[in-house]
């Protein structure tokens, strides 16, 4: 009994350092919000301007890695001895479900406005050229390129899981082939794990910081409850309590059902927007945007605007590449676990095709709807953002649709469920990563899960208190920097080990 307790307890070397670091940063921020904003702007400017090029090269190199996996010597290697655990249709659907978070609904609805109002390549704001490139850039940031980078890491984790039979819950476990067991399980591995956990905590906090205002703005629209920071804090607290109840009462099956409901409701809501917003325009705009993407792809890949210094690639491309980097390990572990029994080529093609289709549908439908509302002068989005904030502008893009009350109820339920499942996933992932010897099928300790959900909630509230998108963007970029190196090490470790255990034929 005593040994069992020790077995399922926290791992101090990866539990306390992230807790202390994040706690201190939150305390310093709350002490002086104005000073924190000054630091945030300085960090954002330094990382994006000095190191933005590194993120762009990272994505390009990982894209070449994808081609190597698909057409190279390992293409037909199978990730595990068993047949695929899920049918291809179920597999693709699970991938789509992983894309329908509230943060995705946030960016999908409003991103195009920023691209049109502050366009790249020196284009005139709100011009025809800016509108033509707007959706194309969304398809670039949320298309095959980032999913190709994820597929490389997913193959790496699937290899360690199902071929090498390793129990990987932290990135240091995968580094044994690269740095040796002594370093992977020693101080070096501990530092790597702590980088991963601190970055992941901030990433999850930013997702919560994006999702919460959508729910509270829905409540204001539906029930007339004024949206305030206090209301945001109350809603986050309610979610944390709900998550604790679900975990304590063994209602995880209910959470999984809620996740399925979220996916089906996403299909329903997107279908509704597609039909009533203007299906023919959406398809024409999408087709045109794919052409624009293909025409400008080389420049987009390497665009740093070093001469014009307009700030577009730093504010968006580097930010999104950091977003993809920071979520890469967590997402790739999930995608690897549902891909047992598939070949390397199947996993790479399935991810790029299935997940690109998911994100392109989301961004095309929601972005086109926002553009139409702007062009028809139904919404004055700049005024809404200036007077009420970004979340209100997003809500109004949904409220402007026919049957607005029913539409808003659907959007409210979708955002609420998406955030409940987000907090549940956050607490589970962090608890699994900071506990000792928790195996698949076992639950990490209740108090640890609740503790992490509380900390993620606090970060979300702190980011909301800072106001605007810049703190959220900076948190992602700062967290993405250390993960940039961790992802590269995991990739190199896989390549080195595969050369031994998957000998070229």
Curated annotation (Swiss-Prot):
Catalysed conversion reaction: 4-(trimethylamino)butanoate(in) + (R)-carnitine(out) = 4-(trimethylamino)butanoate(out) + (R)-carnitine(in)
GO cellular component: a single term: plasma membrane
Any one Gene Ontology BP term: carnitine metabolic process
InterPro entries: BCCT_CS, BCCT_transptr, BCCT_transptr_CaiT
Membrane topology label: Multi-pass membrane protein
Main location, first listed in the record: membrane
Record has Cell inner membrane as a keyword: yes
Family annotation (Pfam families): BCCT
Localization of this protein: Cell inner membrane
Chain ranges passing through the membrane: 10-30, 51-71, 92-112, 143-163, 195-215, 231-251, 263-283, 316-336, 347-367, 403-423, 446-466, 475-495
Pathway: Amine and polyamine metabolism; carnitine metabolism
Keywords: Antiport, Cell inner membrane, Cell membrane, Membrane, Transmembrane, Transmembrane helix, Transport
Signal peptide start and end residues: none
GO molecular function, a single term: transmembrane transporter activity
Subunit relationships: Homotrimer.
Alphabetized NCBIfam families for the sequence: bcct, PRK03356.1
Function field: Catalyzes the exchange of L-carnitine for gamma-butyrobetaine.
Similarity annotation: Belongs to the BCCT transporter (TC 2.A.15) family. CaiT subfamily.
Protein name (record): L-carnitine/gamma-butyrobetaine antiporter
Gene: caiT
């Amino acid at each position: 009994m005593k040994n069992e307790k020790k077995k399922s307890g926290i791992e101090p070397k990866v539990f306390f350092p992230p807790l202390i670091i994040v706690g201190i940063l939150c305390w310093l921020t709350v002490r002086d919000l104005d000073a924190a904003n000054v630091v945030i702007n300085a960090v954002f400017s330094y990382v994006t301007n000095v190191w933005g090029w590194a993120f762009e090269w990272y994505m390009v190199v990982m894209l070449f890695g994808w081609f190597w996996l698909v057409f190279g010597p390992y293409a037909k290697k199978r990730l595990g001895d068993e047949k695929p655990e899920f049918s291809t249709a179920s597999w693709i659907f699970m991938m789509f479900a992983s894309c329908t978070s509230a943060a995705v609904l946030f960016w999908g609805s409003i991103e195009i406005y920023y691209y049109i109002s502050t366009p790249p390549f020196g284009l005139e704001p709100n011009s025809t050229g800016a509108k033509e490139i707007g959706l194309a850039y969304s398809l670039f940031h949320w298309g095959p390129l980032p999913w190709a980078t994820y597929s490389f890491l997913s193959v790496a984790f699937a290899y360690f899981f199902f071929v090498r039979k390793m129990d990987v819950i932290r990135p240091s476990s995968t580094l044994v082939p690269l740095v040796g067991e002594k370093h992977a399980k020693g101080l070096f591995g501990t530092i790597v794990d702590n980088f991963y956990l601190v970055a992941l905590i901030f990433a999850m906090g930013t997702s919560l910081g994006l999702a919460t205002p959508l729910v509270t703005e829905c409540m204001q629209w539906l029930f007339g409850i004024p949206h305030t920071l206090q209301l945001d804090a109350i809603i986050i607290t309610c979610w944390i309590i709900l998550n604790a109840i679900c975990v304590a009462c063994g209602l995880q099956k209910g959470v999984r059902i809620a996740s399925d409901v979220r996916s089906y409701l996403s299909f329903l809501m997107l279908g509704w927007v597609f039909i009533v917003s203007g299906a023919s325009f959406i398809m024409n705009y999408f087709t045109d945007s794919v052409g624009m993407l293909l025409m400008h792809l080389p420049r987009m890949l390497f665009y740093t605007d070093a001469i014009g210094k307009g700030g577009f690639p730093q504010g968006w491309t580097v930010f999104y590449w950091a977003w993809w980097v920071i979520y890469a390990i967590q997402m790739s572990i999930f995608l690897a676990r549902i891909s047992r029994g598939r070949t390397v080529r199947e996993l790479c093609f399935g991810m790029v095709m299935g997940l690109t289709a998911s994100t392109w549908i989301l961004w095309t439908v929601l972005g086109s709807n926002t553009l139409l509302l702007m062009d028809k002068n139904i919404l004055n989005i700049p005024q809404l953002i200036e007077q009420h904030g970004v979340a209100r502008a997003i809500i109004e893009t949904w409220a402007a649709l026919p049957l607005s009350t029913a539409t808003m109820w659907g959007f409210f339920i979708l955002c609420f469920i998406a955030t409940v499942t987000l907090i549940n996933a956050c607490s589970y992932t962090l608890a699994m990563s900071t506990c000792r010897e928790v195996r698949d099928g076992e639950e990490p300790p209740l108090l640890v899960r609740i503790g992490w959900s509380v900390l993620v909630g606090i970060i979300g509230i702190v980011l909301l208190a800072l106001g605007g998108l810049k703190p959220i963007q900076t948190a992602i970029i700062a967290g993405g920097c250390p993960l940039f190196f961790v992802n590269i090490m995991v990739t190199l470790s896989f390549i080195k080990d595969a050369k031994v255990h998957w000998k070229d034929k």
